[in-house]
């Protein structure tokens, strides 16, 4: 019985792909959500914002995600705490799944460089993974549908059959990612 973690991160910006994960200019994780399943049985879930500690949430990211500095300061946990809890879920999973997993896994490796060890960063990098963006693009192509398959909303509407309400909230995106993954596996 496989344990699968569906997860998503929201951040202060895009990773600087040309720079190492340990570069201080790399973005911070503003929210992590994860849902861990053994088959259809929900084993664990979490959804936390990170409290800024010397960094700001840009206005354009607040507009996109709805995460304000005020909310993050009031309801957020220290970013290291969020990272540690997320790492526990990643370690406990056999497979990790995200929509655009290169992005989310990189954000976790950036956090590992800030708060953890090189071994933790490598552990995250080596974890068995699946990407609903890649799987979704293949599915759209196989169905002869137009579109890139990059947007979570686009893939969700095409494969699951409905719009996502509240996208760019990590928990909403995790639920949508799992729905896409289940539909693709069901059709395989």
Ranges and model annotations:
Residues 2-4, 25-69, 87-188:
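Metal-dependent phosphoesterase core characteristic of DEDDh/y 3'-5' exonuclease domains
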Residues 9-22:
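Short acidic, Gly/Ser-rich segments with clustered Asp/Glu that frequently serve as metal-coordination loops
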Residues 74-84:
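Glycine-rich, highly charged phosphate/nucleotide-binding loops
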